[in-house]
């Protein structure tokens, strides 16, 4: 099942109110996110593919943990649940997701994703256009409401295999790259 979520008035009002408190310290961001794992209080994420039009990220969210209630004012985001069960909240509704369900969030839609499965959840996040610092947090159980995207100090560049890290280069025409795990398989063509 794929659900599409449109922006509502409450998203617009909340974003306008929060924009003035936004901390986007881009000086603490790497030149690129390739071969880095970003550590989060809820788990971790890493880039698996990027070109000038799209960035695709792999997220692992621990059981009972949740991302902040946040939005991306300038980019559309799609989430595909690879394994487990999740709850993706917006201002309008609670969206329960199971393995291979997806949600498409228009620009500036506030949302949070919580892992309901005891083994945590694996998620693919597709962002268009690529811009990791396009982030405004409304609520965060870890105290990051006024913070921008995690900086270099929250990024790992060594022992990436501990996180089952993978990255896809741009495939040649008719080529397909695949990453397989015991819980999922991801391909890019």
Predicted segment positions?
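A short, N-terminal "cap"/entry segment at the start of jelly-roll beta-barrel domains
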Residues: 1-55, 68, 135-188
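Short amphipathic
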Residues: 58-60
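Glycine- and acidic-residue-biased ligand/ion/polar-headgroup-sensing regions
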Residues: 62-64, 72-87, 91-92, 186-189
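Histidine-centered active-site/metal-ligand motif
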Residues: 70-72, 111
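Short acidic-glycine-tyrosine-enriched beta hairpin
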Residues: 78, 91-111
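A short hydrophobic beta-strand segment most commonly corresponding to one strand
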Residues: 78, 118-140
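Asparagine-centered strand-capping/turn motif at beta-strand->loop junctions
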Residues: 112-117
């Amino acid at each position: 099942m794929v659900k599409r979520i449109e922006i509502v008035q409450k998203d617009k009002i909340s974003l306008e109110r929060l924009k003035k408190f936004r901390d986007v310290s881009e000086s603490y961001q790497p030149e690129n996110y390739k071969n880095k794992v970003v550590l989060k209080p809820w788990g971790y994420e890493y880039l698996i593919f990027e070109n000038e039009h799209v960035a695709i990220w792999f997220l692992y969210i621990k059981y009972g943990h949740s991302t902040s209630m946040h939005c991306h004012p300038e980019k559309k985001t799609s989430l595909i649940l690879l394994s487990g069960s999740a709850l993706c909240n917006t201002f309008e509704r609670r969206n329960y997701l199971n393995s291979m369900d997806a949600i498409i969030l228009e620009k500036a839609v506030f949302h949070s994703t919580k892992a309901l499965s005891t083994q945590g959840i694996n998620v693919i996040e597709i962002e268009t256009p690529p811009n990791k610092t396009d982030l405004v947090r409304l609520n965060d159980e870890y105290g990051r409401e006024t913070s921008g995207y995690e900086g270099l100090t929250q990024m790992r560049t060594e022992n990436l295999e501990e996180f089952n890290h993978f990255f896809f280069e741009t495939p040649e025409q008719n080529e397909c790259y695949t990453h397989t795990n015991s819980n999922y398989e991801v391909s890019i063509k």
